[in-house]
Amino acid sequence: MKLSEINLMDKYPRSKRNIEERVNLIKEEHREIARKFEKDFFDGDRLYGYGGYNYHPRFWQETVKRFSKFYKLGKTASILDIGCGKGFMLHDFQEFSSTYKVAGIDISKYAIENAMDSVKKYVQIGDAKEIPFEDDSFDLVISINTIHNLELEDCKQSIREIERVSKKHSFIVVDAWRNEEEKKRMLGWNLTALTYMHVDDWKQLFKSQDYSGDYYWFIAE
């Protein structure tokens, strides 16, 4: 079981966040609306989520290249994005290599209905707890800031599901902290996550579910 911590998101642009201001504004009512993952979360007010979820090549193009080179993906590699949203990353995978076979699932009906035209036929409504594909279906399975939106037992199940459908590589990013200050910021910043913990606890959780892929963290900073 290789299981390694690696930042494959180092090419993803980091937005400037005023954590303290946001923490003071977010209320439980905002979290309740955000966790429905409907229009308000993607394209509503910033307090409910993205505040406008639109495609821009600067977000995923370099990260897609990073994935492709790191995992040495072949010309006909199959890639699954769990929590694909409107399919932006899948679009950039196909821009990088038109022979890649891509697929995406998202719990949000709104996101799937508003997916980019270029990938609409490759995405579907789906749950990370019950990934609608056969065992060993994909060369690379990616889940970025998604499985932590599940309760703990469901989160464990989603990790097992990722392991099941991946025949070679997988990469997961989850909300986490390394110290008390980061924990305080995360608890205030978080809108949708239901499972979040110290990085060491995540590592133990991955091992307990026999996860053999790679992982990294979203740290509120």
Language model features with spans:
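Short, conserved loop/helix-junction motifs that constitute active-site signature segments
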Residues: 164-165
